[in-house]
């Protein structure tokens, strides 16, 4: 990323590019810093120079940023963002396109081997989109610098796994992972946003759809 001026007419920037995965960040901390922080700074500086508002993906990991290079990189992004650039602290996102290593992807793909007692606020990807669109439609002026984007309801990973019908052992989670990432979404709700689908509802829908599809398969 070497641009020092905007080549096109740009009204708004939605910056979601980053390397995710807390566990991987423990092995490649320099890559996470360069990609998530240094490259983001170029975007932030360029947009600020050209008066372009920005919404960017932060993370609930900032609440325990010291536990991992990933969390550190997201905390640093918030520190270097300029006025008019808003960080959305996503909790644990699920839905189409999620990484195969994510909990809900493992549930859908049948690759769950164990569960933990971590508490996760699982947020549907379409609810993430609706949160972003609030700022696209209303702008970033006179708003907070960060907002937490989650349902506001945390559930144990082991309970989610059981709800999906898996009987797997419970193990200790990694120290690098937050014990509880439940969001305080009160500020975002003041702007008219609210979540529409819980993780358990999504699981029930997937089970029903998969069952219906199996009924339609030739015998």
What are these regions (language model features)?
Residues 144-147, 155-185:
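C-terminal "lid/loop" region of Rossmann-like NAD(P)-dependent oxidoreductases
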Residues 2-35, 46, 64:
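NAD(P)H-binding glycine-rich loop region in Rossmannoid oxidoreductase-like domains
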Residues 12, 31-42, 68, 72-73, ...:
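Glycine-rich NAD(P)-binding loop of the Rossmann-fold in SDR/ketoreductase-type enzymes
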Residues 198-219:
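Amphipathic terminal alpha-helices
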Residues 15, 38-71, 86:
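Conserved Rossmann-fold NAD(P)-dependent oxidoreductase catalytic core, especially the SDR/UDP-sugar
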Residues 69-71, 75, 79-129, 133, ...:
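NAD(P)-dependent short-chain dehydrogenase/reductase
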């Amino acid at each position: 990323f070497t641009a020092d001026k905007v080549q096109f007419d740009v009204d708004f920037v939605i910056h979601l590019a980053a390397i995710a995965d807390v566990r991987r960040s423990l092995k490649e901390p320099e890559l996470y810093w360069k990609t998530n922080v240094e490259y983001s700074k170029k975007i932030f500086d360029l947009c600020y120079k050209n008066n372009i508002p920005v919404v960017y993906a932060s993370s609930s990991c900032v609440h325990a940023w010291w536990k991992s290079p990933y969390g550190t990189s997201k905390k640093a992004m918030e520190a270097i963002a300029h006025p008019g650039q808003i960080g959305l602290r996503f909790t644990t996102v699920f839905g189409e396109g999620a990484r195969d290593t994510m909990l809900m992807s493992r549930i859908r793909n049948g690759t769950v081997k164990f569960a933990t007692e971590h508490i996760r606020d699982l947020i549907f990807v379409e609810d993430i989109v609706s949160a972003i669109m609030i700022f696209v439609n209303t702008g970033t002026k006179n708003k907070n610098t960060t907002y937490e984007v989650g349902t506001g309801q945390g559930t144990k990973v082991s309970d989610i796994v059981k709800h999906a019908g898996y009987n797997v052992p419970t193990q200790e989670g990694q120290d690098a992972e937050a014990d509880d990432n439940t969001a305080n979404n009160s500020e975002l709700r003041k702007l008219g946003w609210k979540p529409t689908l819980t993780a358990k509802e999504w699981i029930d829908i997937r089970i029903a759809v998969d069952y219906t599809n199996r009924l339609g398969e030739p015998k």
